[in-house]
């Protein structure tokens, strides 16, 4: 499943794992994507939506 929000196009951010031993490796910060059934132009549709958009009310379920 793609970790991209269909509403705001939020996608994963990238950074570093930095443990105490300082061995730095790459990591991904994935957005909290939920698969919800929403109405788009009067028809129900399944969308990948981040929880920020759900809380903001940008999606009608």
From Swiss-Prot:
GO molecular function terms attached to this record: structural constituent of ribosome
GO cellular component: ribonucleoprotein complex; ribosome
Keyword Ribosomal protein: yes
UniProtKB keywords: Ribonucleoprotein, Ribosomal protein
Transmembrane segments: none
Highest taxon, organism lineage: Bacteria
GO terms, biological process: translation
Family of this protein: Belongs to the bacterial ribosomal protein bL28 family.
PANTHER family given in the database record: 50S RIBOSOMAL PROTEIN L28 (PTHR39080), LARGE RIBOSOMAL SUBUNIT PROTEIN BL28A (PTHR39080:SF1)
Matching NCBIfam families: L28
Official protein name in the record: Large ribosomal subunit protein bL28
Upper taxonomic lineage: Bacteria, Bacillati, Actinomycetota, Actinomycetes, Propionibacteriales
